[in-house]
């Protein structure tokens, strides 16, 4: 039995002995996706015990945090309207593309613990959705960092994002393209880059806007980030304002007002782009 089959056998045995520990989606991935297992083995230099421990940890986290149980409508329109995460487009090599917009990154560390945890869960949900979409294939994540200020750098939040990616994206095939990184935030960004594992650090490329089309055609990028595509809508159908989502009623209304005030420009862009005059509520 080779290492992949050995790892698969051990994880499936664990799942059988602990039926509530791993989500059925992940059990199916373990059964059918060799690449999923190979990445953990490669990340841990074929140390089967370490790979097994890391993989089981990831699968338990995915289940306990309910990442497979969520859909777009779980999260508030405010988060989508900012346009910080863009799951859209294909690269010049026909790879899946994900965009991150630095100037629209919110700072949630100064808000309530509940808002912080919701924002972190939103990132994890987007991560998982994208992870399943690319299905082991190489991909490109571009970060448009022009006009990004220090108010967009939330070190406490970003460190948790880095820790999550380090733990759950072993031997990643994603290339990170950082575009127009200004000198003001370069120091902070470099601190975060240094926290990434070696494999991820080696996938980072710095570029200015003139190099973007070497990777992604402009018609595969939304107009609001400098592309030419007008078909992308940041706010998915059925998504409502956080103020009227029953499962988010524990977050005070003033917290939502603070999110809107802090990120007003990006949110207004998102509303205009989606053909809306206001954030969708229970009546829209």
What are these regions (language model features)?
Residues 1-284:
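Basic, amphipathic alpha-helical/coil surface patches used to engage anionic, phosphate-bearing ligands
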